[in-house]
Amino acid sequence: TSGTYYAVGGVLKTVLDSKLTLSTLNVESTGASVANVNMITDGEAQMAILQSDVINYAHEGTNSFDGAPETNALWVAGIYNETVQILAKPGINTVSDLKGKTICVGDVGSGTEINAWQVLGAAGLTKDDVNAVNGSFQDGVDQLKDGKIDAAFTVAGAPTTAIVDYATTNTLNLVSLSDDELAAIQEAYPFLIRDDLAAGTYTGQDADVTCVAIQATLVASEELSEDVVYEFVKAMFDNKDALTEGHAKFGFLDPETASAGATVTMHPGAEKYYKEIGVL
């Protein structure tokens, strides 16, 4: 994901730099979402792109921020969804069906691993109920093809390349969340928003699949003024077409979804813009 975030940041700079009078943009490559929160806390960065769940953990002092909350990175906009997708052998239709199965839950300590256990836990499954193995999603796909595991989790924008490739030569089965599973997940983890993958997102997918997603989220330091952030957010939405030409992910940018996913404090500059256009 760091590759996509860096590319998205680069397009923001290219398109918006000339439009901004109150700030200039510089893009830095970093060590992913947790590092990005730390950089804002330390004053090394003023804005960052990161996963919406990570900003939640930072504000709550959970997971990677256990007992040490960091609250000065504020919500600006959810840019696009990163969907929690569960690729499984045929016959596994709900999360509950994963009981007793061997599942690749992502790399150790990854965001995917955290999201996988959130989804499994909300369905009532503990670490004793499944045989969890760690590895990248590509590892999981390969092991699924070889019959070594029963399912694999990934958290990525759909359509995801590894699933597209898998679907060309294998029977595609993506696990769809039941209404009860979805309700339990959203009650426990409000930052996991509903995301339905429309039929035809992948070859061989003939029905909609109900998933949850986190968002690739733009945050800003609370030390940035309201005026600076307001100007930035307005310029971003005003120049959506040019941004989308630069990177397809900006096609998903929408004021409703950009503001709706906010489960932490919103930056006053962003809030001013959303209220002005009537989505808040």
Predicted regions and their residues:
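Sec-exported extracytoplasmic/periplasmic mature domains
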Residues: 13-21, 41-45, 60, 91, ...
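Extracytoplasmic
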Residues: 22, 32-35, 42-45, 70-71, ...
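Pocket-lining segment of extracytoplasmic ligand-binding domains
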Residues: 52-54, 62-64, 127-219, 224
